Design a protein with these regions (language model features):
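NAD(P)+-binding Rossmann beta1-loop-alpha1 motif at the extreme N-terminus of oxidoreductases
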Residues: 1-50
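Rossmann-like NAD(P)(H) cofactor-binding subdomain of soluble oxidoreductases
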Residues: 53-125
Length: 125
């Protein structure tokens, strides 16, 4: 299964790392300096309880193109950012979209993507 985690904040990075550690084919969509940092040095996450930093060499992309194909896209963005990516999701051929977060507009988000299988989830770290 080919997975894209769309969003490289705290929750998105943790989700991508967990998929990666489980042996899944995961790619992380990140932008700007953060994308360059992950590409160069790997995804580095400081352990909450132990004095260590894990490094995961997760593939990184900086955009989602219409022709990119994934089995599922996990969208892990702030609520205020969701409106800016709906057209990108509509144009992409991936059918399965999971919005991870508070999902205060769940019905509206699903209605905005009528050709997609839209699901909602809440992440725990």
């Amino acid at each position: 299964m080919k997975i894209l985690v769309f969003g490289a904040g705290v929750l998105g990075c943790n989700l991508a790392r967990n998929f990666f550690r489980a042996g899944k084919d995961v790619t992380l969509l990140a932008r700007g300096n953060w994308a360059a940092e992950i590409q160069k040095n790997g995804l580095r996450i400081k352990d909450k309880f132990l004095p260590r930093i894990s490094v995961s060499r997760i593939p990184v992309v900086t955009e989602l193109k219409p022709e990119d194909r994934y089995d599922v896209i996990f969208v892990v963005l702030r609520y205020t950012q969701l409106g800016t990516i709906l057209e990108t999701l509509r144009e992409n051929q991936t059918k399965n979209i999971v919005f991870v977060g508070n999902n205060v507009r769940a019905e509206a988000l699903a209605a905005d993507l009528p050709e997609k299988n839209v699901l909602f989830a809440f992440a725990s770290s």
